[in-house]
């Protein structure tokens, strides 16, 4: 499809940790270039999609289930469609960000990107960024295996809610990580 591989970043994190807030900041910074965003929602209402402020970037919302499990077959097709539209100059972007639901494990998404022949030829996994809530992070790690997986596979962990967390909460959570 393309001579230049398109970087893909997986943005994951705990439920309510602030993934969409971070994504909005990235999209509003013009230094980041044009970004195609794939927003995945678990359930029928795309709440995060409504929270994403309007931007000039293309947002693809897939609502048929958890990105990492039930719609893995749709992810390659969605990315391929984006790449084709980019090649045809129907849309213009330099990178793709996949924002997962807080229930997603990034491993299967990463595996899809690396093992699908078309995706492996046209994209490169740029990294996995996990947003972790400094206030509730330890409890979330205790309660949800998906959160442990999100932290374990992260290239970068961003602590959110540090402005409302107690210094001891932040220190304890950082030590645990």
Describe each PLM feature range:
Residues 2-10, 17, 21-140:
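Nucleotide-state-sensitive switch-loop elements of NTP-binding domains
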Residues 33, 153-154:
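Structured helix-beta-strand junction loops
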Residues 90, 148-151:
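A short, aliphatic-rich alpha-helical micro-motif
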Residues 99-100, 131-135, 154-175:
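G-domain G4 guanine-recognition motif of GTPases
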Residues 116-123, 148-149, 174-177:
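A short alpha->loop->secondary-structure connector
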Residues 143-145:
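Charged helix-capping and loop-helix junction motifs
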């Amino acid at each position: 499809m393309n001579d230049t591989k398109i970087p893909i970043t997986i943005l994951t994190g705990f439920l309510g940790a602030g993934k969409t807030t971070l994504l909005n900041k990235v999209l509003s910074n013009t230094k980041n270039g044009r970004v195609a965003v794939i927003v995945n929602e678990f359930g029928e209402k795309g709440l995060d999609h409504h929270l994403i402020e309007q931007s000039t970037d293309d947002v693809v919302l897939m609502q048929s289930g958890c990105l990492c499990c039930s719609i893995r077959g749709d992810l390659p097709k969605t990315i391929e469609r984006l790449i084709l539209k980019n090649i045809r100059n129907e849309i213009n972007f330099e990178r793709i960000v996949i924002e997962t639901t807080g229930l997603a494990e990034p491993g299967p998404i990463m595996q899809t990107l690396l093992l699908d022949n078309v995706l492996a030829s046209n994209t490169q996994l740029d990294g996995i960024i996990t947003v972790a809530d400094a206030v509730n992070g330890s409890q979330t790690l205790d309660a949800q295996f998906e959160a442990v997986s999100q932290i374990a596979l992260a290239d970068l962990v961003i602590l959110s809610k540090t402005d409302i967390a107690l210094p001891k909460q932040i220190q304890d959570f950082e030590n645990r990580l």
